Swiss-Prot record:
Mn(2+) 2 binds at residues 288, 293, 341. It is an enzyme of class 5 (isomerase). Its main location: cytoplasm. GO terms for biological process: 2-deoxyribose 1-phosphate catabolic process; 5-phosphoribose 1-diphosphate biosynthetic process; metabolic compound salvage; nucleotide metabolic process. This is Phosphopentomutase. Its EC number is 5.4.2.7. Mn(2+) 1 binds at residues 13, 329-330. GO terms for molecular function: magnesium ion binding; manganese ion binding; phosphopentomutase activity. HAMAP family: Phosphopentomut (MF_00740). It comes from Clostridium perfringens (strain SM101 / Type A). Pathway: Carbohydrate degradation; 2-deoxy-D-ribose 1-phosphate degradation; D-glyceraldehyde 3-phosphate and acetaldehyde from 2-deoxy-alpha-D-ribose 1-phosphate: step 1/2.
Amino acid sequence: MSKYKRIFTIVIDSLGIGAMNDSEKYGDVNVDTLGHIAESVDTFNIPNLQKMGIANLHPIKHVAPVENPIGYQAKMAEASVGKDTMTGHWEMMGLHITKPFKTFTDTGFPQELLDELTARTGHKIVGNKSASGTEILDELGEHQIATGDMIVYTSADSVLQICGQEETFGLEELYRCCEIARELTLKDEWKVGRIIARPYLGTKKGEFKRTSNRHDYALKPYGRTVLNELKDNNFDVISVGKIKDIFDGEGITEGNKSKSSVHGMEQTLEIMDRDFTGFCFINLVDFDALWGHRRNPQGYAEELEKFDVNLGKVLEKLHEDDLLIITADHGNDPTYTGTDHTREYVPFLAYSPSMKGHGQLETPKTFATIGATIADNFGLKMPEGTIGESVLNKLV
């Protein structure tokens, strides 16, 4: 019989807790998402993360370590090459990514790809550079509305992003164009991790706002993950936020899209009221998309405080045979130069009301510790070719 009937893993997207040993290879020097956020604000109140021991793992201004934190804590290192969303999440579920996904940050996309995209979609392309979503809309949003051209851009991540104004370009047309882009970028030389549909509203510079109708078209995972094992063995695999997109639906039995990170936590609280056996995997993207990339430490701090209030409600709802794991998929230090992710350790905070002990675990060498622990709990073997060692027997 399983130790835990339900396991909830919440990914606070981009909440790194200090530079990994190899971070300088990624251009990241002295980065520290959580530490630098706390240093950027006058007050910082996260009592529930505090009692789960986050400040015991990592010094945080305004947040003291606690003598007896609930549950277990560890700093997790990333084994894979990269610092992006897909690499982080895929590794959590057992995959070891040894070749980074293709990026076009410095060059933009090849003309041959753009020509094919224009021929297949019927839209001319503007942009074709690395930019923040808000900047590119201010620069080209009015042009798109006037011409029907398609805004294509990228970032430091392995992504091809297409913007479309919902009312003039149309949501279905945007999705159609993204599906064509996904098909074209399955070629090895153009193989990006994700195509992202970026719909927006507004009619003039300074007023454009991206909507919650974003859609990600990810590559299928390179191999079987713990999610596949769970689903194939008739366990529930419920996703919240962009998890279903990240895994291209592989191993998911129920997907729930979120309008915001606060909404994602509300959805999680509703799911906690249901009887199920298996895994609920939650991604809260606003931390990364709204505050990390936009280099807004104050906004990030406020979002963490809102999250912490809802975390308190999650802790109250946990059953004796539930396990909660809180983690992140990479860093995105909002005080660092540029607008890109940062290569950092991430937190592993694990708690169940049935735990008698507490304390810090040794630093796991891979995010796949999470997937291995979940598989172990449900009596499943890790899929062939995956990595990760369970810490289930240490959670007592």
